[in-house]
């Protein structure tokens, strides 16, 4: 189960209630971080939800939403960095459906992660193996014998340049369940 918790009290309540993941975690405290790590609770940062509103703030988004976004964006980034640097488990998600955050554009979340200081390798793991683990899909998210062959073929090396994955123009082919 997931909880879209933003404030510290909501995060703690969700973790103590046994949620598998916290989406957003904007106002995470050290206490939240420690309890999440202790219980193995994932953080799903949903950077696109906040970043895309901020980046498109002049494109017709109501002023009160833009004002809230500006107030929380830096704190959201601090919480994610704090959790990542502490070694907390993270999985990728975007909260698609928020303004300028479209279904199918989830690859930009990797760029946002890397922009915050998450390594390219970790951003890929967060988006594949960790996401599959969070969803209870043990036979997906990694390249292993016996697992489903779900692969994105890209131009370039995402370990060197995350835009190989984050920029949809670099996507060459999708292999799903071993089929192109």
Model-derived regions: residue spans:
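Extracellular/periplasmic catalytic domains that process cell-envelope and extracellular macromolecules
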Residues: 36-37, 85, 144, 165-166
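His/Asp/Glu-enriched, well-ordered alpha-helical/loop segment
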Residues: 73-157
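C-terminal cap of metal-dependent C-N hydrolases
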Residues: 127, 145-180
């Amino acid at each position: 189960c997931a909880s879209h918790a933003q404030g510290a009290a909501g995060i703690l309540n969700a973790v103590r209630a046994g949620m598998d993941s916290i989406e957003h975690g904007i106002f995470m405290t050290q206490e939240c971080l420690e309890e999440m790590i202790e219980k193995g609770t994932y953080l799903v940062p949903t950077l696109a939800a906040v970043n895309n509103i901020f980046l498109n703030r002049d494109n017709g988004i109501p002023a009160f939403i833009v004002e809230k976004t500006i107030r929380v964006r830096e704190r959201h980034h601090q919480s994610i960095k704090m959790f990542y640097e502490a070694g907390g488990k993270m999985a990728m998600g975007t909260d698609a459906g928020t303004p300028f955050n479209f279904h199918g554009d989830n690859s930009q979340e990797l760029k946002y992660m890397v922009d915050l200081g998450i390594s390219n390798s970790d951003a890929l793991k967060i988006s594949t193996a960790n996401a599959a683990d969070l969803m209870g899909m043990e036979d997906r998210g990694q390249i292993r014998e016996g697992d489903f062959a779900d692969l994105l073929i890209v131009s370039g090396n995402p370990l060197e340049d995350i835009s190989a994955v984050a920029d949809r123009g670099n996507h060459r082919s999708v292999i799903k369940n071993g089929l192109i």
